């Protein structure tokens, strides 16, 4: 029997609630507009993550980039000006190929890079062979840019299923979703983006933001977001660091 594992970190008291929610939603893909499930695994099952330790004060600002020429550099400038040297950028490799200088700066500034595949296709609609082909192409592109040993994957379009998780496991990727959605790509207004993040954020959260050209208000919202995170006593770390010291417990969803 195939098994799909759902983890939640250090919240044993919420285990029953998590199991009920997971059973109710297990047949659905994970999309940007949906409330994400806590999806984790042991070494014996598919692996994904949406949140770190809830008892921690660490959080992770993550930025997706799949297209555009105008937003990434200003966002990097804003992060640097506000003392953030450890964000996590999930890059489409086709975009990275066209912007080698920006990729080099992301690394130089101290940020972590994760993959969003190559062609920004919906992996949930692809056969395993097609997913592997795209992952291989992305891996080759990143290696040519000097970015090696990428360990994090955020599936293109934000959608994934059991098959995607299984293929990602074969490549030793940890699939990363998010627990706080800024909705910045919808350009709802600077104050709304700030509220979407700061009104619900807590320890362990992975925050979804964008540095593609579609996200026109993110740069302006960032200083207030960072300031309010600090006021709450929260500290930004890379996703890699966020999950590195996690003490997780598992529950099986069949």
Swiss-Prot record:
UniProt key word Kinase = no
Report keywords, A-Z.
Hydrolase, Signal, Sporulation
Cite the GO molecular-function annotations of the record: hydrolase activity, acting on carbon-nitrogen (but not peptide) bonds
Known InterPro entries for this protein?
Glyco_hydro/deAcase_b/a-brl (IPR011330), NODB_dom (IPR002509), PdaB-like (IPR014132), Polysacc_deacetylase_ArnD (IPR050248)
Annotated compartments: Forespore
Q: Among its keywords, does the record have Nucleotide-binding? A: no
Which cysteines in this chain are paired by disulphide bridges?
Answer: none
A single GO BP annotation from the record?
carbohydrate metabolic process
Query: Which top-level enzyme class is recorded in the Swiss-Prot or TrEMBL entry?
Result: hydrolase
Residues forming the NodB homology domain are 57-237
Check the record and name the CDD domains matching this protein. CE4_BsPdaB_like
**Which domain of life does the protein's organism represent?**
Bacteria
Task: Spell out the GO cellular component terms annotated for this protein, sorted alphabetically and separated by semicolons.
Answer: intracellular immature spore
- Enzyme Commission code(s) on record: 3.-.-.-
Q: Where are the transmembrane segments?
A: none
* A Pfam family hit: Polysacc_deac_1
Q: Which SUPFAM superfamilies match?
A: Glycoside hydrolase/deacetylase
| Reported regulation of activity | Negatively regulated by SpoIIID.
Q: Could you say which residues form the signal peptide? A: 1-24
**NCBIfam families (alphabetical):** spore_ybaN_pdaB
The entry sums up its family as follows: Belongs to the polysaccharide deacetylase family.
Biological role: Necessary to maintain spores after the late stage of sporulation. Might be involved in cortex formation.
Q: What is this protein called?
A: Probable polysaccharide deacetylase PdaB
């Amino acid at each position: 029997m195939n098994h799909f594992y759902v983890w939640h970190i250090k919240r044993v008291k919420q285990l029953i609630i998590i199991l009920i929610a997971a059973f109710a939603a297990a047949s659905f893909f994970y999309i940007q507009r949906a409330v994400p499930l806590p999806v984790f695994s042991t070494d014996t099952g598919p692996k994904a993550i949406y949140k770190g330790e809830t008892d921690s004060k660490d959080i992770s600002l993550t930025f997706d980039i799949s297209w555009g020429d105008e937003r990434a550099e200003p966002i990097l400038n804003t992060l640097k000006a506000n003392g953030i040297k450890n964000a996590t950028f999930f890059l489409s490799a086709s975009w990275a190929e066209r912007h080698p200088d920006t990729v080099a700066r992301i690394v130089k500034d101290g940020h972590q890079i994760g993959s969003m595949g190559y062609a920004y296709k919906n992996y949930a609609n692809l056969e395993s062979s097609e997913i592997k082909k795209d992952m291989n192409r992305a891996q080759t592109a990143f290696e040519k840019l000097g970015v090696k040993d990428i360990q994090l994957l955020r599936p293109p379009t934000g959608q994934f299923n059991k098959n995607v998780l299984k293929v990602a496991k074969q490549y030793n990727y940890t699939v990363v979703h998010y627990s706080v959605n800024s909705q910045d790509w919808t350009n709802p207004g600077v104050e709304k983006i700030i509220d979407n993040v700061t009104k619900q954020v807590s320890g362990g959260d992975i925050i979804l933001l964008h540095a593609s050209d579609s996200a026109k208000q993110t740069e302006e919202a960032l200083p207030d977001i960072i300031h309010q995170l600090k006021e709450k006593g929260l500290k930004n770390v890379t996703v890699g660091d966020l999950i590195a010291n996690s003490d997780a417990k598992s529950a099986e969803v069949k």
